[in-house]
From Swiss-Prot:
Coiled coil spans: none
Name the record gives this protein: Ribosome-recycling factor
Family: Belongs to the RRF family.
Function: Responsible for the release of ribosomes from messenger RNA at the termination of protein biosynthesis. May increase the efficiency of translation by recycling ribosomes from one round of translation to another.
Single GO molecular function: ribosomal large subunit binding
GO BP terms, alphabetized: cytoplasmic translational termination
Cell compartments where the protein resides: Cytoplasm
Primary location recorded for the protein, binned into one broad class: cytoplasm
Amino acid sequence: MGTIADDILDDLHGRILKTLDQLRTELAAVRTGRASLHLLDNVRVDYYGTPTPLNQVATLSVPEARLIVVKPWEKSMIPPIEKAIRDGNLGLNPMSDKDLVRVPIPALTEERRKEIVKQVKHKGEEHKIAVRNVRREAKELIEVAEKDGDISGDDAEKALEKMQKETDEGVKKIDEIVAAKEKDVLQV
């Protein structure tokens, strides 16, 4: 197969892996009823006028299954940290002590679990669409290269087959990631 086709397939592979990583990252921030530092990954704290990731202004730990402890490096950061977590649309209610913030993780209701599963499935679908869009773009590049005579018809056919296989594997992996997260959320 021609190097152009190989380059296109390598790019496709890399972009599918990136999509899978992005899905894992997004799903790590989804609440499951147990404490996880990833829950607070998207929380931004107002640090002297700049929205800053929480883990850049404090140390986070999980001492118990349903508790996250946030220990700011500066005591003056306690009120903004509390506000950022409360405003983070995570359904969490932080409480401050003199030098740290405790974030109890409430148990999820059955209704809330089902809602979260819906969100998880939706994120999975969005990422499947992203994978298919990557395949479509790569397919167009192969077709243009074939039309321009840069690769032969046989090489184009082989590349399209490999592309489809790669896409199917990516979609299957997304299904596996979503199923694992679903199981995690529904587990009481």
